[in-house]
């Protein structure tokens, strides 16, 4: 996909600064949850997932576009970066964002939204949702003064959004914490979904 944009409207990841806040829309592993429900429905049913729960997960694909929230974010002054989550899940996407913006990122693990259906499926199959393909979720960075407006406008559009972290000093990498305690950031050589298809 290629296109043009006025220089004044360009949102470049290299523009992130120390103190910018990090938001994500929807939840982790939206696409991965849907794919697993579509491709491994019988297996999930054998593991105890009800047919209506599986159907709910399949319909996650109906909500996979990030264009609506990207359009809203582009209209808010103070947005410094956007990055869509894809293969490798949220963990990989945040590493990519850090690398592209050349700043470390602090992430509050307990603030990362996980749909109950995703948690259930990943628990049954032994997968980590942080490394599961996550198309459908958009990462956003913004100046602190813009955060409240950005949250408000995205929610007004009917889209879930959460504040999950903050841009730190120049460099590359993720500083993860849970309830203010440092924790190890998960890294994945391949998307978690490949373990299902290669089994």
What do the PLM-derived regions correspond to, one by one?
Residues 156-199:
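Acidic, Ser/Thr/Pro-rich beta/coil linker or hinge segments at domain junctions
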Residues 135-141:
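A short beta-alpha structural unit
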Residues 58-134:
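Active-site-proximal betaalpha loop/short-helix elements
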Residues 7-15, 25, 70-71, 95, ...:
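A generic local secondary-structure boundary/capping motif
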């Amino acid at each position: 996909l290629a296109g043009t944009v006025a220089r004044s409207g360009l949102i470049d990841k290299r523009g992130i600064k120390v103190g910018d806040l990090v938001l994500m829309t929807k939840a982790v592993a939206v696409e991965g949850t849907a794919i697993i429900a579509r491709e491994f429905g019988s297996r999930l049913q054998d593991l105890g997932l009800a047919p209506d729960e599986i159907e709910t997960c399949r319909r996650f694909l109906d909500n996979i576009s990030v264009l609506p929230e990207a359009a809203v974010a582009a209209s808010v002054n103070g947005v410094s970066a956007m990055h869509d989550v894809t293969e490798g899940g949220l963990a990989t996407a945040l590493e990519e964002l850090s690398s592209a913006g050349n700043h470390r990122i602090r992430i509050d693990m307990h603030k990362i939204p996980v749909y109950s259906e995703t948690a259930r499926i990943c628990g049954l199959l032994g997968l980590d949702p942080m490394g599961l393909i996550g198309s459908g979720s958009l990462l956003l960075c913004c100046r602190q003064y813009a955060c409240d407006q950005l949250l408000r406008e995205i929610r007004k559009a009917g889209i879930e959004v959460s504040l999950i972290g903050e841009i730190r000093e120049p460099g590359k990498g993720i500083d993860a914490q849970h309830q203010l305690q440092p924790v190890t950031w998960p890294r994945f050589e391949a998307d978690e979904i490949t373990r299902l298809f290669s089994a």
